Structure formats: C-alpha cells, structure tokens
Amino acid sequence: MKGWFGLNTTAMTERVLIVLHQEQSTPGRVGYSLRQRGYELDIRRPRFGDPLPKTMADHAGAVIFGGPQSANDPDDFIKAEIDWIGVPLRDQKPYLGICLGAQMLARHMGQRVFTHPEGKAEVGYYPVRPTAAGRAICDWPDHQYQWHREGFDLPNGCELIAEGDIFQTQAFRAGTGYAIQFHPEVTHAMMCRWTTRGAGRMELPGTKQRHEHFADRPVYDHGIRAWLAEFLDHWLALGQRQLAAAE
C-alpha cells in the first residue's frame, strides 16, 4: 500500500464528492489525505441547496460527513441524502459515511438509528476493536475519536468490521460502502472548535471532559493518522478494482 504521502497518478484528474452539513464545516484530515493522493474535492452542502449527482460517472467516490443533525430528522435534505446513498452503491463506487454519514448508510440499508438506552454518549477517545474482517483491511489503533449520542445495529447482509463497548456497532461494510461511527478526520483545530461550541455534549453520561480530549490526543492520534492513511488506500482501491473489471 502507498504511504501517507503516496500519490496515485491515475487519480490526478479524478474527483471525490464531499458532503458536509454546516456552512463552516471542512473535510479535515480526510480531505487533506485525498488531496495528497491527487484527488480533487467536489464539496457540496445539500442542506443549503447543493444538488447531488444522479450518477457517479464523474466521481471516484463519495464521503458523507457528520453534523449536529440526526439520521431520524424529518428534514427533506436528510431523507434525500439517505436515498442518494443508493447511487454510489449501485454504481459500485466507494462510499464512506462518517458518523451521521454512517447512520445514513445504516438507515439506507433498513436499520434503525437509536439513542443509548441509558442516555450515554461517546464524546472523546474510546476503545474500538476490529473484527477479523476489519483486521484484514488494515492495522487499527486502540482508540478512535468519537462525537455522537446515537448509534445503529448491523444491517442485514452487511459485514461488521469494528465494535465498541457503549455502542457496539462501530463500523461495517455494505458492498463498496463503509460506515464508521468515529471521526478520523478531526484535526487539532477542529477539536478546539467542537469542544468549545459543543461543550454541552460533554455533560451527557459516558462522555469525556474537554481536558481529557487534549490529554488523549498525543497518545492516540499517531495511530489514527496511520489507520486513516491505510484505510483510504484500501477504500480508494475498491473503485479502481471495479474500473479495471469493467475494462
């Protein structure tokens, strides 16, 4: 596999669709990593009226990020995004759902999204354990950064690739689609913003306090960076294999 700065020259003109849910949101480390691999980011915000493509012919993959919304919200753009996930799955292009985007994939696959029965949330660094299928993809760090109070069960026909303690299903695969409940995209600047603007979330049961986030970051972030690099190489290769098979 390519290293952190490995560039795929065949991807120099390819685009990855990036779906964000707030005006000031960024794709963080995921966006940086994709650019380092030669991909152009096509950033869209359906919440503010940006359309989503009817096919993936002009995109190498798609990433739907998180946000303060719930996959259970009645907003039209939430329902539209959940339905739209069928486009990359149909076209056999890589799809990655992060947090809200993962919950949307679970909903698309017919699974429910729910709050913890004891009102617990995961905000901070938490243990995540890969399954045998997850270990076959890449090496995993001991912890991942989390920021959510809803979770999901494994949809029928999907493959569990990571699990946790508070919310058991942490990551799964559905064809060329991946759902991850955690946030490998978070940079130090993003953590500063989230823990300031979202301070109220750290009052929920089970969450880590702000000082713990910053104390844990130097302990776990190196492993998360390495995981993201290896995972993205695997994820992008899904689309390249489909393209080679079609030719």
Q: How would you name each of these model-derived features?
A:
Residues 1-11:
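N-terminal amphipathic/basic-hydrophobic helices that include classical n-h-c signal peptides
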